[in-house]
Structures are given as C-alpha cells and as structure tokens.
Amino acid sequence: MYIGLISDTHGLFDNELCKFLEPVEQIWHAGDFGNEHTLDEIAAFKPLIGVYGNCDDWDVREKVPLYQSFNSGGMKVLMTHIGGFPGRYDYNAFKLIEEIKPDIFVCGHSHILRVMNDKKRNIMVLNPGAAGVMGFHTVRTALRFKI
C-alpha cells in the first residue's frame, strides 16, 4: 500500500498538499488537523487514519482518537501526536510502545521531519514534520512510502 503521512496541518489542506498526496492510496495524519473542516476535507480526498493533537478542538477529538494501533501491509503501526524519538520518547508514548510493540511508530508535534530506526526496540520511527504553515518551521514537509 502507498501511504501519505502528514501531521500538523493546522487548518491547511491546499492544492500543493493535494498534489503531493494524489498518488497515495491512504493518508495517515499524526494530529493537529487544526479544525473539523480540515479533517473532513482530507477524509473526503483519500481514506484516512488519524489521531488528534494537542491543538485540536473537541469536534476533531470526537472523530479521531488520541492514539491508534493498526496493521498495514503486515506491519503493526502505532500512531499518536506527541511521541518524541528513540532515547527521548514522551512518557505516555513510551508506555504505549512498550505495551503494543509496534513495527512502525508514527508521531507529529515537533514540526521536525524525522525518519529514525530505534535499534533497541526494532521500530521504525516516522515523524513527517509539519504540512501546514503555522509554527516555527520554514519548510512544509510530508512523507510518502510503500508498505
């Protein structure tokens, strides 16, 4: 399956992002949609798996959970918004990682694109950075990959 991974859209789902995501079969969103309208736009564009972020309001939180664990292409995936990275995981994310033992851990929040291997736990850690324009970052980022 061809996946488009985004996070931290903060209310922006524009033509540039649509063009980038056009070839994918499914979109994963690691939180901070920005509002319910943006979540609905993305879900209408492609099948969506998402979680809410710390900036999302109750309308978004009623539609997507704090974290999701699911299988894709034979891989166990864990997604939450605030996650950290190997050696510096958020405490709640670390508890979920230890409990679920995913093959792939997806998070957002930092607005920093990272693809890392947690060698200790044999987990691929993916943070797509920020696809929106709100925040300190100067470049919008997202990921596409095949499982």
Regions found by a protein language model. Name each.
Residues I6, V51, H81, I104-V106, ...:
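Acidic/histidine-enriched, beta-strand-rich ligand/metal-binding domains
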